[in-house]
């Protein structure tokens, strides 16, 4: 049995927290379906998509939605990708990894991204400076 055979048996959960982003969600769902059905490598992965919408008027709680997605699907998954609805799956390796991986390395205007910045509008020193976003893969034992 090769390493790739083991990776394809692992169960991937993609959690997408959002609020008031219906158009982006439609585009994300459409693109994700095509990506994982047609991509030469990733079409063999066992993928489940978990869309979580915050429906109240309280401040958006990305972390709580991520935790809820994990807890609801904990028995299903071997690893998880936390994905911002604004970042579409592109050329990335979604196969299992024992350590955290940033899957989307470039954002708006092809500028480098880091897991703590999901937007080009983040102001240094703001509460959002340490925001965990983009597209990050984590094994279950680390989450």
Q: Where would I find each of the regions flagged by the language model?
A:
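Non-catalytic membrane-proximal stalk/linker segments that position and tether the catalytic domains
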Residues: 1-6
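Active-site-proximal specificity loops/subdomain of glycosyltransferases
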Residues: 26, 38-77
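A conserved hydrophobic helix/loop-capping motif in glycosyltransferases and polysaccharide synthases
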Residues: 13-21
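Conserved catalytic core of nucleotide-sugar-dependent glycosyltransferases
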Residues: 57, 61-66, 70, 79-83, ...
